[in-house]
């Protein structure tokens, strides 16, 4: 018998790039894998229930943002000048609707703000203080910038800042969920 093909797929990763062997202890690597497994399980269960791919992406990214282990939300990398500023973007591949925020410092879950931009505004992007005012208007949770600080990221920033390399590499976290449904292709110019 031919195995039944799943009606959906879920892909996630906790950062791009290859970390040199020995960067993390086996316990730290286990913590990364456990959190990714938790996020994948939540996303898989949502897709099995029939939740939309966009809802799944938002929920899974929020799990990563809430964890100090990943470079999204809590645990974000520091900018070259020692600040924490975050971006997030989300898109519905079926409708081509998109929303994003950039350069924010107090929105607990930037992905929720990006989703709110997509669903509740005529714009595609808000940035900085404007993005934070938008998030407050829609009662998204705001936190003090210290919430995002982790000693690990501070030490990484300090090491890069003090090095002669002169740059700071930012690894991105991302999630993608696909639903196997017919998609009506639209002329992109009709959308924008």
Each model region followed by its residue ranges:
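Alpha/propeptide regions of enzymes that mature by internal proteolysis
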Residues: 2-192
